[in-house]
């Protein structure tokens, strides 16, 4: 069993087996140009710590994903998403260890078959690879994604100038209002999938 932060996992009984728990740390810039920056993040980094780092440095693309629980290594596996943004929007490549061949492999985002809360890591490659590092491509001149109604409404309440920090804080307020602190009200969290229907039905 490969386990990250433990979100989206609910054990109903003891697990009698081996658990792999990636602890790779670190956030480093590996390349950049005038408009974009490529950031390599350890699989063991808490996801929201990475988002906070990106916002602090003025890099856009993941601010809408603030306060999502779990570790960075799970981002490409689950293709995490919220408020109109998904991991696939910024994912560049994934560094893994092939458990069968005991070697390092780099997988491009295009080969991860990223879909709504899904990827090839949850299908054919389940338990085949352990994610060690993930490389994201972030924007130096971010375009804010405010299509999700509640974010825009929350921002209008404060009247502050629009920026990465303000969007992150708005998302955090929204998420905290929906679910109490686990330390106060213990729970398995909130995990769900919206139904996917044909476009003709959606109309």
In which residue ranges do the predicted regions lie?
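Phosphate/pyrophosphate- and phosphate-bearing ligand-binding catalytic cores of soluble enzymes
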Residues: 104-203
């Amino acid at each position: 069993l490969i386990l990250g932060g433990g979100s989206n996992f609910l054990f109903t009984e003891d697990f009698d087996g081996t658990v792999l728990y990636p602890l790779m740390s670190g956030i480093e810039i590996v390349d950049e140009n005038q408009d974009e920056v490529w950031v390599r993040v350890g699989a063991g980094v808490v996801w929201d710590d990475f988002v906070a780092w990106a916002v602090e440095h003025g890099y856009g693309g993941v601010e809408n994903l603030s306060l999502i629980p779990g570790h960075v290594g799970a981002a490409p596996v689950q293709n995490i998403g919220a408020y109109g943004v998904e991991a696939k929007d910024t994912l560049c490549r994934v560094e893994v260890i092939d458990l069968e061949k005991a070697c390092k492999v780099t997988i491009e985002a295009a080969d991860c078959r990223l879909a709504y809360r899904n990827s090839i890591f949850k299908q054919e490659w389940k338990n085949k690879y352990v994610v060690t590092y993930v490389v994201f491509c972030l924007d130096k001149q971010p375009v804010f994604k405010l299509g999700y109604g509640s974010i825009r409404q929350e921002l209008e309440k404060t009247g502050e100038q629009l920026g990465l920090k303000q969007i992150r804080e708005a998302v955090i307020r929204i998420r905290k209002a929906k679910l109490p602190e686990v330390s106060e009200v213990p729970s398995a969290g909130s995990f769900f999938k919206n139904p996917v229907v044909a476009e003709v039905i959606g109309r």
